[in-house]
Amino acid sequence: MTSQKTILLSFDVEEFDLPCEYGFAISKDEQMLVGMQGTLAMQKILTQMDVPATLFTTASFAETWPTMMQQLATKHEVASHSYYHTDFKNEDLLL
């Protein structure tokens, strides 16, 4: 008898805002571009391995890259990760 092992994968698919959290200025355009480049690299690996994942995205990132997000949603679960969390406010949680 063979037992099948399962793993659940989730990724943050968002703007690259980590430098901002440490006081370094990075433009929103650059944040979005770096986030998109990382997302494409992740997507390539998941596609090669034929592995689904849950992708937590900010609405701001999804609005910037709607075509890519629609494409990702055909194979992966896409979930909310607030509107924009660099300068997190309670309003970011509102629908």
Report the location of each language-model feature.
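Catalytic alpha-helical scaffold of carbohydrate-active enzymes acting on polysaccharides/glycoconjugates
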Residues: 1-95
